[in-house]
Amino acid sequence: MAMYLELSRPKGDVSRWEKVLKRLNLLNKNYPLENARCGYNSFRRGFENNSPNKDNQAEIYDIARESLISQGLVFFGGYANDLYSHYMPKRQRKKNKKFPDFDVLSERPKISATILKERLEDAGFKKVKISLKKGVGEVIAPHYEILVGPETIAFIYEPLACHSYNVIHIKGKPIKVATIDTMLSFYLAFIYANRPYYDRDRILCMAQYLFMVQQKNRLEQKGLLRRFSINCVGTQDTLMSVREHKAEMYQKLKSKR
């Protein structure tokens, strides 16, 4: 997880990338991500059959997707995984079902969640709620869950570093999609977070699928498959900022020794 995280931060210490990448390749060669139970169907969660909004999930998907795109947020969940599946053989591609299941990065997650809630309410949907979830140490920031009735449709996270992404265009609209290294760093963190809303097996399958995409297209370095992008979302701590923070804390605490 830490190695993927380091490779996903273009404003970090990039001088270490070559060494980290060599070690990561060696690790993946000997201990690849594998789960024999994984299939190639959609990894996104659909609504339950008895859900009051079962017949409206395609409309909710369209509204949520357009709202998140228009806000310029970075996709890294099931929707992003589906976009990467286009670079696999046809038999291994995932069906593009309109399941409203999004994970995105936003530098203003509360505002982004509120905007999405308002768009859904403007379309006539009731019981739209925003639920704040606690973070997990310095790995996962506090995040917002958006629900329509009992169904979760999105999680919006604040980045804890500057995470890399690529920009693609679909029907003339720019869409920000996290790099595979960014996505894997989050997925592996979710697996060990021990939260009830993180399906460990599902996330492991998503991580395995992304690893397959990356290995099959490792020589492709353009568009969505560009691995080392300079575009990133969030604020990255630098050596200078760490030293400044250390000096501030020293001045603040020196009289309490």
Question: For the regions a protein language model found, what residue spans apply to each?
Answer:
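N-terminal regions immediately upstream of nucleotidyltransferase
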Residues: A2-A58, R257
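Structural boundary micro-motifs
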Residues: D13, W17, Y197-D199, I203-F211
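Charge-rich, solvent-exposed alpha-helical interaction surfaces
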Residues: V20-R23, R119, K252
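Active-site nucleotide-donor binding segment shared across nucleotidyl transfer reactions
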Residues: Q57-K110
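Short, conserved charged micro-motifs
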Residues: K110-K117
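Conserved catalytic core of two-metal-ion nucleotidyltransferases
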Residues: R119-S164
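Phosphate-handling catalytic interfaces
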Residues: Y165-Y198
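Eukaryotic intrinsically disordered, low-complexity regulatory regions enriched in Ser/Thr/Pro
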Residues: T179, L204-A207, Q214-R257
